[in-house]
Amino acid sequence: MKAASNSVSSAGGSVSPTTTQPPLPPGQSSHPQIYDQQMQYYFAAAMPNQPMATYAAQNGSSQQYAPAAPYYQDANGQYVQVPANGSMAPQQHMMVSGQPYLYMAQPQQGAQQVMQSGQPQLIYYQQSMAPQAAPMYFHPMQAAPMLPEQMGVMPHTQPAIPPQQQPRQVGVEISSTRTAPLTSSTPLPTSLEYETVQRDNRNRNIQFRYHRVMEHDELPIDEISKITLDNHNDDTMSAEKENHFHEHRGEKFGRRGFPIPETDSQQPPNYKTRLCMMHASGIKPCDMGARCKFAHGLKELRATDAPARYPNNKYKTKLCKNFARGGTGFCPYGLRCEFVHPTDKEFQNIPPYQRMSHDDQDYDQDVIPEDYVVARHQPRFMRTGGRATTPTKVMLKHRNVAGSMMCLSNAGRDLQAGGDYNQPESNEDDLPPHLRRNRRENPPMNKRRTSLSTKWTSEENLGLRGHY
């Protein structure tokens, strides 16, 4: 305690020479106190049993004050002033945050000490107290600077107190040394305790998530027995396909700017908007029957609800190649064909040289065209030798959307050296303009065209040296 008094005197200023210094408190030579500059935390020894007089320096003047009223320590560890009449006054907490108090034991002599300005206040207690261990406070995460006189002081040994058995969580261990700030009663966990608690929390969360996943994955046996193949028959699959079709149809109409039709009706928008060709022909009944999406008569024919198509500027402006020269006279598209057919009123605007000849029409009327039928052609070229060769049109298996790709072949052609061909008599009006002019008997063949044209009546593609 002597070292602490000297340090206080040196820090606060010089003491008046006329004033007698108080002697050392009893029983404190073996229990030193360590004082830091911030005056926030301190070490204290056991309190004595004898009454202690209280001396306090309230200001920095050199005047001497009389002993103050005694104090006592309540259950919370706070020191409360005891009034003179002995009655219990309202509790007055002497420990105030921000004020430098240093609690010391009672001196042996009753001399008073006058403190200079800037010195810490020394408070002595007169209330008799039972010997008890004072709390030990440490500066958290910061070591207090020690004075030179304190370097060789031995630490104080606190009396052993049996710890109370308290229920704690599994895996959490409490250290014997509790570190806490002065204004807090809850000890801070050490690094070992913190790591133990974090590890237990992680293990608990992993097990909780695992059990939740298992609960969702497990299905009762009763629900599994209800899942059979009967729930997914053809009717349900077809209904799912129809719903999928209506959803995509509504999305397409919405992207194109048209109003989305109602999805109440399960039929497509063009249902029964055209006549069934099989039923209208009257040859045989329609194989589809009631499932046919085309109208079987005018009673079933209804107006279309589908939005109108954008107009085609080239609609019905060119002759269909199936009805041109060398055509089969049959169009697989029928009424859906966008080219001119002989039954259309636009057929009058087609030049005669582009139309099918009358001989082709008369001959092809008796021929029922099929997908793989070889369409016969009228013999155009006659040999002077007497035997006629018949160029035939061979339809390929791979057809395009415009019609069958056909090539000409001269089957059984037996040409002799020096033979010539004679063209049958024909009207010049039926010829195209580039063939109406007078041509030489033997035109040069050095500039023969070898393009893959679809004009099946072109003599240049045949490789013949004749002319019309």
UniProtKB/Swiss-Prot annotation:
It comes from Caenorhabditis elegans. This is Zinc finger protein mex-5. It comes from the Eukaryota. Gene3D superfamilies: Zinc finger, CCCH-type. The gene is mex-5. Keywords: Cytoplasm, Developmental protein, DNA-binding, Metal-binding, Phosphoprotein, Repeat, RNA-binding, Zinc, Zinc-finger. Residues 451-460 have a biased composition (Polar residues). Residues 243-254 have a biased composition (Basic and acidic residues). One of its GO terms (biological process) is regulation of protein localization. The modification Phosphoserine is found at S458. SUPFAM superfamilies: CCCH zinc finger.
